[in-house]
UniProtKB/Swiss-Prot annotation:
This is Large ribosomal subunit protein bL21m. It is found in: Mitochondrion. GO terms for biological process: mitochondrial translation. The keyword Methyltransferase does not apply. Component of the mitochondrial large ribosomal subunit (mt-LSU). Mature mammalian 55S mitochondrial ribosomes consist of a small (28S) and a large (39S) subunit. The 28S small subunit contains a 12S ribosomal RNA (12S mt-rRNA) and 30 different proteins. The 39S large subunit contains a 16S rRNA (16S mt-rRNA), a copy of mitochondrial valine transfer RNA (mt-tRNA(Val)), which plays an integral structural role, and 52 different proteins. Keywords: Mitochondrion, Ribonucleoprotein, Ribosomal protein, Transit peptide. Belongs to the bacterial ribosomal protein bL21 family. Signal peptide: none annotated. It comes from Homo sapiens. Residues 1-39 form a transit peptide.
């Protein structure tokens, strides 16, 4: 019985000591203690309907604000009008184009020479039209295709000026101490085209 009463007394003493240690003392102790309790209660309680900002509640990237459709339509009409005026007056400088021909993309302008790594079924002097035009640009504007520009909008013409063969390549195979040696000379046909003209329609729309 004495041991149990001693244990209870020691427990109460330890609890009182811990409360006295944790609770601040002094002239401003009451206000400091109330302020700390109020801060803890505010930090752990949220307003009704509040959702913390996390990667699940909102994406980590910044929000993209789309332009007003009416304003975008008006701006598009102004740009098309300016481009049409430059095309009509011819104040757009030298044109360049990106065309897809012979399984490759070529950036060309007038009087350029391009070397095709295969033989075309055309004679020298024949004129052809490059129909797959991906892009046409000038000093102040650029027309992009999705993926190609219309045939009635852009016209790129070229002329076959030369049909020749590539420089010979020597392929040599040799096995030492086997008396094996094999030599092969490889040449590939080539075609040279000259870009004659790049023309665009006088009106985009």
């Amino acid at each position: 019985m004495a041991a149990s009463s001693l244990t209870v007394t020691l427990g109460r003493l330890a609890s009182a000591c811990s409360h006295s240690i944790l609770r601040p003392s002094g002239p401003g102790a009451a206000s400091l203690w109330s302020a700390s309790r109020r801060f803890n209660s505010q930090s752990t309680s949220y307003l009704p309907g509040y959702v913390p900002k996390t990667s699940l509640s909102s994406p980590p990237w910044p929000e993209v604000v789309l332009p007003d459709p009416v304003e975008e339509t008006r701006h598009h009409a102004e740009v098309v009008k300016k481009v049409n005026e430059m095309i009509v007056t011819g104040q757009y400088g030298r044109l360049f184009a990106v065309v897809h021909f012979a399984s490759r993309q070529w950036k060309v302008t007038s009087e350029d020479l391009i070397l095709i790594g295969n033989e075309l079924d055309l004679a020298c002097g024949e004129r052809i039209r490059l129909e797959k035009v991906l892009l046409v640009g000038a000093d102040n504007f650029t027309l992009l295709g999705k993926p190609l520009l219309g045939k009635d909008l852009v016209r790129v013409e070229a002329t076959v000026i030369e049909k020749t063969e590539s420089w010979p390549r020597i392929i040599m195979r040799f096995r030492k101490r086997k008396n094996f040696k094999k030599k092969r000379i490889v040449t590939t046909p080539q075609t040279v085209l000259r870009i004659n003209s790049i023309e665009i329609a006088p009106c985009l729309l």
